Amino acid sequence: MKFNSTVYAVILSAGLFTQFNSLADNLDKALINETRTTDNIKRDNYRHPKQTLEFFEVKPNQTVVEIWPGAGWYSEILAPYLQAEGKYYAAHFPLDTKVSYFQKSREQYQQRLKSNTAYSDVIITEFNPLTHTDIAPANSADTVLTFRNLHNWYMNGGEDAAISAFKSFYKALKPGGILGVVDHQMPENLDQNANKNSGYVKMSQAISWALQAGFELEASSEINANPKDSAEHPKGVWTLPPSLRLGEENKHKYLAIGESDRFTLKFRKPK
């Protein structure tokens, strides 16, 4: 019996289309799930979670590690999205940290996880780029994600901390796994070291650190770009919303700029 190749191609295409739609539907549901707070949803306009997670190829049956989830902005999306078929590691601040802000953030995050069954399967691990680097079992993760954290490691630990962070991500990922990095983008014509405490990082610098750890750059995206942001502000990135460190001073100006210009980079661990 002969099978028509055209019919087979149509069936295959239909199957792939259905699978894609199913993934999109699952993510859409995660974006409007009951655990998301109104204030966090309002920031979707700047953080573009759907487009960002799709760019990083995050799927509901994957093992995903999020680095320093903070108060849980992305946890509200990832925990329910991965709960049924996947696994979600939240690599938070270490319990033995001496930094009071980190202590409070970790406590509040743990309390948040107890507030809803959507978070019941979240696995908390610990991360500090120089002292706590076991974010997940080696070669176990399909995806590692870090949102607006790289500048902190560079500010507080220099290049050694930044490169160490990328090495820990590399260790946790399966061969072929994806690392997604988003951070505040410093223009390439500015001096990185002179503006170290601005909260901005050059995209070229982030790429260099990742390559030194063994990653391959697969793609970049303008999903989270903001051309209105010059990255030159009196209080660094915290001059802009949502921080607005200058209070009422020039508030309208900074609100008009919006949240920071951000690079979005997708790296892959070679197979």
Where is each model-derived feature located?
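Class I SAM-dependent methyltransferase Rossmann-like catalytic core
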Residues: L27-K59
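A short glycine-rich, Lys/Arg-flanked "PGG" loop and its adjoining helix->strand segment in the class I
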Residues: A79, D160-P175
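Conserved beta-strand signature within the Rossmann-like core of class I S-adenosyl-L-methionine
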Residues: A91, G176-H184
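Conserved class I S-adenosyl-L-methionine
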Residues: P60-G70
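A short acidic, Gly/Pro-enriched loop at the edge of an enzyme's catalytic core
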Residues: Q62, T133-L145
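S-adenosyl-L-methionine
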Residues: Q103-T133
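Short glycine-dipeptide loop
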Residues: N61, A84-E85, L173-L179
